[in-house]
UniProtKB/Swiss-Prot annotation:
Name the record gives this protein: Beta-ketoacyl-[acyl-carrier-protein] synthase III
Family annotation (InterPro entries): ACP_syn_III_C, ACP_syn_III_N, FabH, Thiolase-like
Pathway(s) annotated for this protein in UniProt: Lipid metabolism; fatty acid biosynthesis
Similarity annotation: Belongs to the thiolase-like superfamily. FabH family.
Organism: Brucella canis (strain ATCC 23365 / NCTC 10854 / RM-666)
Enzyme class label: transferase
Region annotation ACP-binding: where it falls in the sequence: 251-255
Role, per record: Catalyzes the condensation reaction of fatty acid synthesis by the addition to an acyl acceptor of two carbons from malonyl-ACP. Catalyzes the first condensation reaction which initiates fatty acid synthesis and may therefore play a role in governing the total rate of fatty acid production. Possesses both acetoacetyl-ACP synthase and acetyl transacylase activities. Its substrate specificity determines the biosynthesis of branched-chain and/or straight-chain of fatty acids.
Subcellular location(s) per record: Cytoplasm
Gene Ontology cellular-component annotations: cytoplasm
Entry's EC annotation: 2.3.1.180
Subunit-level organization: Homodimer.
ATP-binding in keyword set: no
Catalytic reactions of this protein: malonyl-[ACP] + acetyl-CoA + H(+) = 3-oxobutanoyl-[ACP] + CO2 + CoA
């Protein structure tokens, strides 16, 4: 059987780092308040000339180089983002152009913070269906452009950045010891769309709008939804939490991460946490955390890695991948 194997990984962050203390002159908050409630200490904020496309392209180049490939080897560019450069064409097409790719196809996928999980799952289906051999999967965001910088409950939470992986078709044996994606489960429930959304859009207000969130409601649903979809992935493979080498969750809030790991009985030392230095980068969150753990030597070839994320909609999902 065909498996989608991770061939390369890369990331990119804006130059500007904004620490918690930098918010004290903008809104009523403090470093202690932010750290205690979120675990965030700093985040990167896009500056002049740094866009979703430029960050996504930089992460993509790094992933392709890490894979030992050329841009011309890529069949599909799949970008997960909620902050595209333009309403259309897709920012994935712009990244395709930046990379000099003139073959294959490219499109955007929008599932907010779950975007990268949705994108990996979609890429896996294209690979296993024979429509693509190598897929560049990117999560890139510039949420700083849709924040209400007078709302202290949201503006302190988010950062900008991009992460990317190259998935490649490889022959597997149908075993959980195979390298590549072993299971993926996606969910959504539109009944919760008012709990996390942006209050603008082309067909309604003709504006970009700002992010709005009912933080307590999101927290209340997050742990249960995340653990349920992970359990479905375990059930599909016969694997358990004890088999996991690394848990790479969406980096939204350390309290949600800790509660999810505890409910799943995953040891703290197996949890990859970068929310302290990146904040919530939405669709870029999981690949940025992955890239960090690969770069520092934690995630190695053959490791079983559990990915998960939850975002506005609500949307949520989980992926089990053998590195």
């Amino acid at each position: 059987m065909i498996r989608s194997v991770v061939r390369g990984i890369g990331s990119a962050l804006p130059k500007r780092v904004m620490k918690n203390t930098d918010f004290e002159g903008i809104v009523e908050t403090s470093d202690e308040w932010i750290v205690q409630r979120t675990g965030i200490r700093e985040r990167h904020i896009a500056g002049e000339g740094e866009t979703t496309v430029s960050l996504g392209a930089a992460a993509a180049r790094a992933a392709i180089e890490n894979a030992g490939l050329q841009p011309s080897d890529i069949d599909l560019v799949l970008l997960a983002t909620s902050t595209p450069n333009n309403t259309f064409p897709a920012s994935a097409v712009a990244i395709q152009r930046e990379l000099g790719i003139t073959r294959g196809f490219a499109f955007d996928l929008q599932a907010v913070c779950s975007g990268f999980i949705y994108a990996i799952t979609t890429a896996d289906l294209y690979i296993r269906g024979g429509m693509a051999r190598r897929v560049l999967v990117i999560g890139a965001e510039t949420f700083s452009h849709i924040l209400d910088w007078t709302d202290r409950t949201t503006c302190v939470l988010f950062g900008d950045g991009a992460g990317a992986i190259v998935l490649e078709a490889a022959e597997g044996h149908g075993l959980t010891s195979d390298r590549g994606i072993l299971a993926a489960n996606l969910r959504s429930d539109g009944n919760h769309k008012e709990k996390l959304y942006v209050d603008g859009g082309p067909s309604t207000t003709q504006t970009v709008g700002h992010l709005r969130m009912e933080g307590r409601e999101v927290f209340k649903h997050a742990v249960g939804m995340i653990t349920d979809v992970i359990e479905a992935s375990f059930e599909a493979t016969g694997l358990t939490a004890e088999d996991i080498d690394w848990f790479v969750p969406h980096q939204a809030n350390k309290r949600i991460i800790d509660a999810s790991a505890k409910k799943l009985h995953i040891a703290e030392e197996k949890v990859v946490i970068t929310v302290d230095r990146h904040g919530n980068t939405s669709a870029a969150s999981v690949p940025l955390a992955l890239a960090t753990a690969v770069a520092d030597g934690r995630i190695k070839k053959g490791d079983l890695v559990l990915l998960e994320a939850m975002g506005g909609g609500f949307t949520w999902g989980a992926v089990l991948v053998r590195w």
